[in-house]
Structures are given as C-alpha cells and as structure tokens.
C-alpha cells in the first residue's frame, strides 16, 4: 500500500464486475484484507451483471468507487467504457483492473503479472513450447507472457478461426511430446461443473509435462487430477489470483 494512501472517514468502495460470480475469490480476499488492515470504512461489492451495458449504472449508484476488478466475460467489452488504458492492456486487448480517480476510469491488466510470477517457478529446462486451451479473454494475458518468455505456443479452440489455432481433435501424441506445457484458459471444470474437463489425450502425458490451470475452484480440477495421475507437474490458478489481486491493490491505492 502506498505510504501516501490515506484512510478516509467516508466509505471507500471497490468491486468485481462479472457474470455469475457469487463464488468470487475477490470479495472474500479483499474483505479479509480490509479487516487485517483495520480499514473499517472500506467495502467490496460483487457487481453481477447480465450485460456490459449495465456497467454505467454501477458507477452512478456507487460514486464512492475507487477501483474495480473485471472478470469473465467482460475483460474485453469493458474497454469501450474507459478513459485511459495502460500500454500492456492495450497490447493484450483485455482489462481486468480499473483505477477510478477524479471520475476518470483507467484500465490495467494485472493478469500478466499474476500469471508470469505464478507460472515461472515450476518451469523446467525441457519446457520449451506450450499448448493454450481456449482463445477467449483469459488466454490473452497468457499469450503475452509466453511471448515475453520466448515460449512458442499453439492455441486450441473448439472452433478454430485463425492460422495459429487448432482443434482438440488435432492434439496427438507427437504434439504432446513437443509442446510439454499445457495451459487451460477455458472455464471447463470450474465449480459447480467439476465433472467436466478439457478433452485432451491425458494418457500421453508424463513427468515431462507441466499443466497449469487458471481455474482455482475447485483447487484440483479433473484437468489437473488427470495430469498428476500421469506424472505431470501441475498448478492451479489460486496463486495467480492472489498475486494479481495484490498488484491491483497497489494500483488502486497508489497516488
């Protein structure tokens, strides 16, 4: 927290904008953080909206908002409502953090920071190439980080459109051997649909593979469980969320 950040006597609000987010990590995390820091005048809301066009109404109803997190499916759609956007968020085309200062909305992407710092510690020398499952907003920060780390990748989509996208049916033994990192950027397997999982050839996985799931609830998705059963290194998205949340807090409270 910035040393110039002052605890005000009036209410200070933050929130999460998304769809179907009653289970959200953010509200619990920041409510506990406010309690630990004795910020009794701070509150965190879940803004569960069906359509991005409902976003301006949130701002009108809560003029005391100082910062917002943005989650699926609005990380791309939110951009048109912003006054400014960071260079990284502009390059990615997705925003998951908004700082509100003097009624100006400034967009950032802290997913980059969260993913890179959670993903890198388990990288091994043989992890040269990656498979990204999913092509939505969540995959954009992952692609950005992999490019930064000079890790080539292919994108897997149910409905491939671009040249660098392939189908799930294209994932064979040779690809799994060559692309030893597999990152799940789809919501498949998220609570409550915990019996679902991306359809990849898990039987071809072994101890050389590294499976990273952006999902954090449940803590072990079937994607990770099946990978672990075949000897792969696995990691869920909880630490990534914690790291990006702390980054968002620094952005919100910096002068």
What does each of the following model-derived ranges do?
Residues 2-122:
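Phosphate/diphosphate ligand-binding glycine-rich loop within oxidoreductases
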Residues 18, 107-112, 119, 123, ...:
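Glycine-rich adenosine-cofactor-binding loop
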Residues 20, 159-160, 217:
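Residues in the short beta-alpha loop(s) of Rossmann-like NAD(P)-binding domains
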Residues 70-77, 138, 187-190, 217:
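Short glycine-rich anion-binding loops that position phosphate/pyrophosphate groups of nucleotides
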Residues 101, 123-129, 205-207:
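Short helix-loop-beta connector
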Residues 117-118, 233-255:
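Active-site capping/gating segments
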Residues 148-165:
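NAD(P)-binding Rossmann-fold cofactor-contacting core
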Residues 164-235, 239:
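Rossmann-like adenosine-cofactor binding region
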């Amino acid at each position: 927290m910035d040393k110039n950040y002052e605890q005000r006597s009036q209410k200070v609000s933050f929130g999460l904008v998304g769809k179907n987010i009653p289970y959200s990590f953010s509200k619990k995390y920041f409510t506990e953080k406010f309690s630990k820091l004795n910020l009794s005048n701070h509150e965190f809301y879940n803004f569960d909206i069906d359509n991005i066009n409902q976003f301006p109404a949130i701002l009108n109803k809560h003029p005391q908002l100082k910062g917002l997190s943005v989650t699926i499916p609005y990380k791309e759609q939110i951009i048109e409502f912003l006054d400014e956007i960071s260079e990284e968020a502009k390059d990615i085309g997705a925003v998951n953090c908004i700082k509100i200062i003097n009624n100006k909305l400034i967009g950032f992407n802290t997913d980059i920071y969260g993913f890179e710092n959670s993903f890198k510690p388990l990288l091994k020398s043989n992890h040269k190439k990656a498979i990204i499952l999913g092509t939505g907003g969540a995959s954009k920060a992952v692609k950005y980080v992999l490019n930064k780390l000079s890790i080539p990748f292919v994108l897997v989509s149910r409905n491939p459109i671009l040249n660098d996208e392939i189908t799930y049916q294209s994932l064979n033994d040779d690809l799994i051997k060559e692309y030893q990192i597999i990152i799940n950027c789809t919501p498949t397997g998220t609570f409550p649909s915990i019996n679902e999982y991306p359809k990849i050839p898990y039987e071809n996985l072994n101890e050389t593979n590294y499976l990273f799931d952006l999902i954090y609830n449940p803590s072990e998705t079937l994607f990770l469980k099946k990978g672990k059963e075949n000897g792969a290194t696995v990691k869920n998205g909880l630490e990534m969320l914690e790291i990006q949340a702390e980054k968002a807090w620094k952005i919100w409270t910096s002068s």
